[in-house]
Design a protein with these regions (language model features):
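Active-site neighborhoods of metal-dependent hydrolases
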Residues: 174, 179-180, 185-206, 210-233, ...
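Glycine-rich, proline-tolerant flexible connector loops at the mouths of alpha/beta enzymes
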Residues: 147, 229-239
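Metal-associated gating/positioning segment near the N- to mid-region
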Residues: 91, 96-169
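Bacterial N-terminal signal peptides that target proteins for export
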Residues: 13-32
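Divalent metal-coordination and catalytic microenvironments
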Residues: 60, 80, 101, 112, ...
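Extended hydrophobic/aromatic segments used for targeting, binding, or gating
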Residues: 242-253, 257-286
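Histidine-rich, glycine-flanked metal-binding segment
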Residues: 48-54, 62-107, 123
Length: 385
């Protein structure tokens, strides 16, 4: 059984884009990233009274999301708020649910969702999240719903052709179509780079960097909760550390967080963690590392030092957290099996060359024999089967 992650809504229908809700969510997320749930007690502001409850959940084992041991309690709800947590035997309610010693917890937060368009084209599909106990969905990882270029195509939504450029417009569409979960977005710096610079391996001029910063500012004003990167994928792979600091510093003015799929998760893992920490330190924001791992068996020993780097940053006063997925597989686009240098002229230009047999032979040889880059063929066992 799951209670809403903000411990105040029970209908699960509101998108959390308005300032008070965002501020509360930011505070809760920052405090509880490592467990990806929000404290049931710490984020509830509803006061109990002696009146009847609308709903009373009894005989529950409560896991509050704050790292505490579970405890037995009853939960009283009035309207869309949790009114009381404790021993409520004998209290009246319009509806009583016997939890029968099951666990009751705050709703889980999906820390890295990637269904930006699906939420609009098929809102009921979000029910699959609810059935897993997920009540808040954080979307991003370099790519994001906004900003979009005026040249980006419209999206087919329930019979309508809709386009948007900003998060403000995107959130309006979410509210118009309605979704059954809370939705939170960061601004993907891949998106920002693509709108201003395209897909090529180029560095921004001073004027272009200011344009990129303005896009981040607009996204934060519209309700984004931070910036995100996916630094193994073009064109994000071409961004310098300094560029990422400058853009994330803008998000820091709004209490934002830096979320990152780091530049390397294998032989250069430690350098990638150092870069993530440097970006957070330079921008003055908390850092959250997506799916921390040491890919490739030869790199497994690096994990101890990786955790030591994070612990050291935390001991020094930085807010650095990470998540790990509980399986040994990896999902990645086939384009990531090729060296990023091949995309320097843009993805479309590279794809036009793939019909050349000589290039295809060169690509295969490079994948099978080199390792001075994050070569995922090497990490997964060097076997095409």
């Amino acid at each position: 059984m799951m209670l809403p992650d903000n411990a105040q809504r029970t209908d699960g229908t509101r998108t959390m884009r308005h300032a008070p809700a965002l501020n509360r969510l930011r505070n809760c997320l920052t405090a509880a990233f490592s467990v990806a749930v929000v404290s049931l007690i710490g984020c509830s502001s509803a006061a109990d009274s002696d009146g009847p409850f609308d709903v009373l959940i009894t005989n529950a084992r409560v896991v509050d999301g704050a790292g505490n041991p579970w405890f037995r309690a009853d939960i009283g709800i009035r309207g869309d708020r949790i009114a009381a947590v404790g021993a409520l035997v004998g209290r009246s309610a319009d509806r009583t649910i016997d939890a029968e010693d099951r666990v009751v917890s705050p709703g889980f937060i999906d820390m890295m969702g990637q269904a930006t368009t699906v939420l609009l084209t098929d809102p009921p599909s979000a029910e699959s999240k609810l059935r897993q106990g997920i009540t808040t969905y954080l979307s991003g990882e370099g790519g994001s719903a906004a900003p979009r270029s005026p040249e980006d195509p419209a999206v087919e939504m329930q019979g309508d052709q809709r386009a948007w450029q900003t998060y403000g417009e995107y959130f309006q569409l979410l509210e118009h179509y309605g979704i059954p979960i809370n939705v939170v977005h960061d601004v993907g710096l891949t998106q920002v780079r693509r709108v201003v610079l395209g897909d090529e391996d180029v560095q921004p001029t001073a004027e272009q960097l200011e344009e990129m910063k303005l896009l981040v500012r607009q996204a934060m004003e519209d309700g984004a909760v931070g910036t995100s990167t996916s630094l193994i994928y073009p064109p994000a792979v071409y961004a310098t550390t300094e560029e990422l600091i400058e853009l994330t510093r803008v998000a820091g003015e709004y209490g934002g967080v830096y979320f990152t799929h780091m530049r390397n998760e294998s032989h250069a893992l430690l350098d990638a963690i150092r870069e993530a920490i440097a970006i957070g330190s330079g921008a003055g924001v908390p850092v959250h590392i997506y799916h921390l791992k040491a890919a490739g068996q030869e790199n497994w020993p690096l994990m101890a030092d990786a955790l030591a780097l994070i612990d050291s940053a935390r001991a020094g006063g930085m807010d650095v957290t990470a998540d790990i997925y509980p399986y040994i597989r990896n999902g990645i686009g086939l384009g990531s099996f090729l060296h990023p240098r091949h995309y320097a002229g843009g993805t479309a230009a590279f794809l036009e060359t793939l019909g050349d047999p000589a290039l295809r032979a060169e690509l295969r040889l490079e994948v099978e024999t080199t390792s001075d880059w994050e070569n995922w063929y090497r990490h997964v066992g060097m076997n095409w089967d």
